[in-house]
């Protein structure tokens, strides 16, 4: 195994360190200012009397000798209008500090991580500024959006990775690591879940009147032709695995019909320019025969609709990710992945039992009756979140459970870093020998 020295910027709780140490890396220093993160980091890597935390990177100039500089640069709200404002936001300024440290210390290579918004077309200028700045310092620069799911982590987590290698080293052939297939399911990872007897992929394929297959998966990680192995609680979209508040709360068939009509028409441009617009009583009455405004008021009382001061109506649960009653998605035990863990928390939960069905209607009905109504679902625990992020069971966390969810959500997934570390080794960056990933 090729050994190399690295420095862990924006170290958090050590996701980068775990990954790089697994492939021969030796951490010579770290930099972190979050006190809760520092406490967890020190629990897992005692200082032996010498504090190697460099602190605030904005005050750092010369770094200890190292080969690779790494870090998950805190994200900024990527809504920059022009080049002159590109790093005005304090979080954007941290990119300028990272570039400065690379310029001063000239590591052989670097790996930096950021949220997927950095590669959004709206933020193309910001990305180009960052990449060009590194190129101007003499680095060959590569970037790619990687999903942790593709590296054995049971989480749908897209992140941008920027890799740079000194051009003067004349190393060619760097490529991002290949994806790995995994057959693991959430019931392999999370605690006390019922092991399903029937896999969802065995549910018969749905076809239209012309015999063409209907792809009912609504996530890029869901196999084509298979039902989602999670249900979405929301009032603004429809689909085989979408569940609406009027399917949960006591409502009449007439009320259900009214709600479905509103949902199907609220995005019509005649009612406004938004992706979903409030509608007046007159708007809705044109679509629902014999509608009395009292019917809409009853739905307001049931907290299915809300009424604005101008008299227009909108769904009470009008944000997709806000879900219903604080729950957005409920994943089944046989799901291949969980939702993205974030520092701000999440509205995803896990079902304690599995359900199946011969068709979409039966599948949804069984979920509502067997999981949703009896509330056989729950939030994940800290230890489960750690596993979903790729941390080992031996890792020690903070005594504050709320802090742990934030710290885990902020961390990079160590298995992705393992793969990136191997990819760097394969271009003979540290030793003149061949290797295989």
Curated annotation (Swiss-Prot):
InterPro entries in the cross-refs: C5-Methyltransferase, C5_DNA_meth_AS, C5_MeTfrase, C5_meth_CS, SAM-dependent_MTases_sf
CDD domains from the UniProt entry: Cyt_C5_DNA_methylase (cd00315)
Active-site residues from the entry: 75
Domain SAM-dependent MTase C5-type: 4-431
GO biological process: DNA restriction-modification system; methylation; negative regulation of gene expression via chromosomal CpG island methylation
GO MF entry, a single one: DNA (cytosine-5-)-methyltransferase activity
Catalysed conversion reaction: a 2'-deoxycytidine in DNA + S-adenosyl-L-methionine = a 5-methyl-2'-deoxycytidine in DNA + S-adenosyl-L-homocysteine + H(+)
Keyword vocabulary terms for this entry: DNA-binding, Methyltransferase, Restriction system, S-adenosyl-L-methionine, Transferase
Family indicated by similarity: Belongs to the class I-like SAM-binding methyltransferase superfamily. C5-methyltransferase family.
Function description: A methylase that recognizes the double-stranded sequence 5'-GGWCC-3', methylates C-? on both strands, and protects the DNA from cleavage by the HgiBI endonuclease. This system is less active than isoschizomeric RM.HgiEI.
Protein name: Type II methyltransferase M.HgiBI
Gene, per the UniProt record: hgiBIM
């Amino acid at each position: 195994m090729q050994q190399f020295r690295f420095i862990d910027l924006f170290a958090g709780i050590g996701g980068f360190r775990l990954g790089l140490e697994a492939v021969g890396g030796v951490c010579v220093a770290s930099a972190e200012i979050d006190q809760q993160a520092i406490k967890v980091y020190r629990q897992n890597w005692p200082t032996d009397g010498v504090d190697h935390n460099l602190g605030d990177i904005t005050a750092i100039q010369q770094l200890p000798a190292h080969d690779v500089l790494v870090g998950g640069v805190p994200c900024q709200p990527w809504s920059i209008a022009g080049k002159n404002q590109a790093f005005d936001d304090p979080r954007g300024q941290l990119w300028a500090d990272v570039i400065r440290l690379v310029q001063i210390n000239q590591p052989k290579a670097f790996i930096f991580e950021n949220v997927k918004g950095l590669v959004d077309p709206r933020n193309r200028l910001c990305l180009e500024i960052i990449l060009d700045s590194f190129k101007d310092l003499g680095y060959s620069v590569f970037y790619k959006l990687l999903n942790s799911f593709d590296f054995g982590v049971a989480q749908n987590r897209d992140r941008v990775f920027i890799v740079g290698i000194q051009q003067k080293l004349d190393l060619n052939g760097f490529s991002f690591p290949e994806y790995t297939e995994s057959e693991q399911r959430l019931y392999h990872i999370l605690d006390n879940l019922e092991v399903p007897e029937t896999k969802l992929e065995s549910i018969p394929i749905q076809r239209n009147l012309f015999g063409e297959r209907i792809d009912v998966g609504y996530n890029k990680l869901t196999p084509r032709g298979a039902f989602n192995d999670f249900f979405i609680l929301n009032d603004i979209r429809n689909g085989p695995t979408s569940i609406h508040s009027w399917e949960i709360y006591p409502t009449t068939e007439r009320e259900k019909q009214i709600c479905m009509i509103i949902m199907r028409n609220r995005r019509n441009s005649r009612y406004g320019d938004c992706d979903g617009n409030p509608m007046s009583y007159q708007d809705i009455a044109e679509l629902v025969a014999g509608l009395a405004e009292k019917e809409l008021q009853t739905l307001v009382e049931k907290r299915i609709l809300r009424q604005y001061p101008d008299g227009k109506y909108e769904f009470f649960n009008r944000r997709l990710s806000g879900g219903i009653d604080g729950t957005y998605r409920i994943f089944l035990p046989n799901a291949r992945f969980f939702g993205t863990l974030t520092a701000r928390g999440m509205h995803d939960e896990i079902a304690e039992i599995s359900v199946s069905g011969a068709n979409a209607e039966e599948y949804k009905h069984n979920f509502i009756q067997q999981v949703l109504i009896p509330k056989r679902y729950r939030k994940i625990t800290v230890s489960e979140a750690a596993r979903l992020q790729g941390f080992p069971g031996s890792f020690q966390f903070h005594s504050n459970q709320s802090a742990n969810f934030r710290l885990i959500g902020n961390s990079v997934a160590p298995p992705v870093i393992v793969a990136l570390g191997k990819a760097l080794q394969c271009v003979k960056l540290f030793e003149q020998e061949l290797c295989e990933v």
